[in-house]
């Protein structure tokens, strides 16, 4: 391979964080010659903020990434040191798998997978500029002058895009603590005509765990039987740890109030808006000042690392104030500060500039993923990265993009929210954002998405075999339980209380009753004892939701019909009589591709949607007439 060929790729991914790793892996698995551009190889997979993966809503995203043969679930399973299933007492649809992770193990596991991935080359260096051929991306210029040619670029800059760190009155440029920001790319993005904004996130101080009084604290243990994220993980073998729990005190709050003027958040130094659901400790005291304390989880950052992450006291107060605060918190009175907490501002692009493929509307072949799109969180970034990387590979190959619908995946919900509604603050995933969350459960992510991964060519043979084995077992168990039935009278003999209506019910039907599980049915049909534990749980959950799923299917069908009703690219919104000028302007700016997308434009009423549909039908009629006219002229 000559030097020109060595610098030519199908897809270039800029950034080696959670979005970048998923993007690079997905593009490479799709068959694209892929380059992952990052400042240093040893920063690939670094967990910039909290040492944890998953949680409520976020755990669903990790399972979906895994179902599409992504990396995050497998890496988290290797590095997880405190697995907990959140919302365990609630229904399966809203349970959230989560684990604290050993930072070093996570980073090393991610680097190993990236290194072993075929079609993927890691290029160390800083991305200085984007190269275009007209309105199409054609390459990337590195800080050292090298030019990498490509057919598509995925930009995953995280907090590095014009990153600015705040610690009290101190401010300095950085992508994260100790690393340079990306300064030139924002100018290039502005020159393309993108709308840029500023967002902010924060992180708490890091503490020396050897100086914490653990004996005085309540402790939280991991689940006795850790539940892996990935289908590819048989069992969790990493040792599990405890974390400590403490609280702020009224004295803590007094110190914070007395120093609010020194906080970057409240002194006017920060322009960007922070995440509502991950507030700084200053925000907590200002907005919830009536509380006598706020909970703090003391999370060890690794099995052989004494660093502790105090989850709950993110701050941009000066370092001396942070030290004073620690002295007022039980168990932390003598804690040594290893790194101060800080806030970081960074540029992002209005995600309404994107198509649902995560390709920008203005520049063909340029894809964005992660915090540059206004999201917060490793899981949100990773999910976007996978979709962007896959579609970048398909763009480079001349194939149609993969679009995930709201009815199919939490990833589809997130992307649709971003591209149709935009963000006014960092976006994070919650189960409440999904209309069809009963069908979009963490436990059925493989069933929903693995066939798609196989269809588009990003599924490994090993995962395909595992998936088919799991599905075959579930299908057989479903068939067996549906073939076994019992009368209400006979069920009463086994202490199962059913309506005495004379209707026979199958074992599968009985599993939908809240007080009936497979253990109780084995007393009636001993052959059911042969169903393995994993299949048993999947079957019980499926049967439990079967009735609700039938009802939800009609709602899903309506939305799918609307998604299929395309808006022609040449439709003149100004020509729609009866539509307000404000809506015409919004539609021209947003360029929705389907009726479903148009419905989610701010201000769209049912009447406005009806006018739009009528105009589409008129447009279709004119197009048909024009085609017939041309055909007639050709025949003449």
Swiss-Prot record:
UniProtKB keywords: Cytoplasm, FAD, Flavoprotein, NAD, tRNA processing
PANTHER family with a match to the protein in the record: GLUCOSE INHIBITED DIVISION PROTEIN A, PROTEIN MTO1 HOMOLOG, MITOCHONDRIAL
Similarity remark: Belongs to the MnmG family.
InterPro entries: FAD/NAD-bd_sf, GIDA_C_N, MnmG, MnmG-rel, MnmG-rel_CS, MnmG_C, MnmG_C_subdom, MnmG_C_subdom_sf
Cofactor: FAD
Sites where the protein binds FAD: 15-20
Major location category of this protein: cytoplasm
Domain of life: Bacteria
SMART domains assigned to the protein according to its UniProt record, in alphabetical order: GIDA_assoc_3
Annotated Gene Ontology cellular component terms: cytosol
Listed GO MF terms: flavin adenine dinucleotide binding
Record localization: Cytoplasm
Functional note: NAD-binding protein involved in the addition of a carboxymethylaminomethyl (cmnm) group at the wobble position (U34) of certain tRNAs, forming tRNA-cmnm(5)s(2)U34.
Gene3D superfamilies: FAD/NAD(P)-binding domain, GidA associated domain, C-terminal subdomain, tRNA uridine 5-carboxymethylaminomethyl modification enzyme MnmG/GidA
Keyword Flavoprotein attributed: yes
Upper taxonomic lineage: Bacteria, Pseudomonadati, Pseudomonadota, Alphaproteobacteria, Hyphomicrobiales
Binding locations of NAD(+): 274-288
Protein name: tRNA uridine 5-carboxymethylaminomethyl modification enzyme MnmG
Assembly and oligomerization: Homodimer. Heterotetramer of two MnmE and two MnmG subunits.
Organism: Brucella ovis (strain ATCC 25840 / 63/290 / NCTC 10512)
Any one GO BP annotation for this protein: tRNA wobble uridine modification
